[in-house]
Swiss-Prot record:
Belongs to the anti-sigma-factor family. It holds the Pfam family HATPase_c_2. InterPro entries: Anti-sigma-factor_SerPK, HATPase_C_sf, RsbW. It catalyses: L-seryl-[protein] + ATP = O-phospho-L-seryl-[protein] + ADP + H(+); L-threonyl-[protein] + ATP = O-phospho-L-threonyl-[protein] + ADP + H(+). SUPFAM superfamilies: ATPase domain of HSP90 chaperone/DNA topoisomerase II/histidine kinase. It is an enzyme of class 2 (transferase). Negative regulator of sigma-B activity. Phosphorylates and inactivates its specific antagonist protein, RsbV. Upon phosphorylation of RsbV, RsbW is released and binds to sigma-B, thereby blocking its ability to form an RNA polymerase holoenzyme (E-sigma-B). This is Serine-protein kinase RsbW. One of its GO terms (molecular function) is sigma factor antagonist activity. It comes from Halalkalibacterium halodurans (strain ATCC BAA-125 / DSM 18197 / FERM 7344 / JCM 9153 / C-125). Its EC number is 2.7.11.1. Keywords: ATP-binding, Kinase, Nucleotide-binding, Serine/threonine-protein kinase, Transferase.
Length: 162
């Protein structure tokens, strides 16, 4: 079985909110070219925008850039968002949220911190690595039946940068 190397598109943009729209337009065009459905394209745009907004809001005190790479396979797209800003502690993040009580109205939920859960819901696989900055890898398969049954949440394991 021959493994095909993915086509890769890379971009670096300032970590400023006005560039999140540029990234959304870029990923929309790429996903459309690959043949994703309208709903999947919208999900991908939201997930990528959330990841970029996290960089804008949390990675840097001032200035800085975010790197994006789009790895295009026959059956999926892997999107990697990186920054060189403040590292992210997943365990501390989980503890800060506390348990979510489903019996309470949504207005009573703690504000903020739901971006990663939204990303995890919209994408098929999510992996995060914290080191000198954050690397967030998100995968969306073209077909639902290609999603690996073992994918069950946000993974804080090592993600190799491609």
């Amino acid at each position: 079985m021959r493994v095909h190397q993915p086509e890769t598109i890379e971009m670096t943009v300032p970590a400023k909110s006005e560039f999140v729209g540029v990234v959304r337009l870029t990923v929309s065009g790429i996903a459309n070219r690959l043949g994703y459905t309208y709903d999947d394209i919208e999900d991908i745009k939201i997930a990528v925008a959330e990841a970029c907004t996290n960089v804008v809001d949390h990675a840097y005190d001032e200035g800085g850039t975010m790197g994006l790479s789009f790895h295009l396979y026959e059956d999926r797209m892997e999107i990697i968002v990186t920054d060189q800003g403040q590292s992210f502690d997943m365990d501390a993040f989980r503890e800060s949220l506390g348990p979510i009580d489903g019996s309470k109205p949504i207005q009573d939920l703690k504000e903020g911190g739901l971006g990663l859960f939204l990303i995890n819901t919209l994408m098929d696989k999510v992996e995060m690595k914290e080191d000198s900055g954050v690397v967030l890898a998100m995968t969306k398969f073209l077909q639902r039946d290609e999603v690996d049954n073992r994918v069950d949440g946000i993974s804080a394991t090592q993600t190799e940068q491609r």
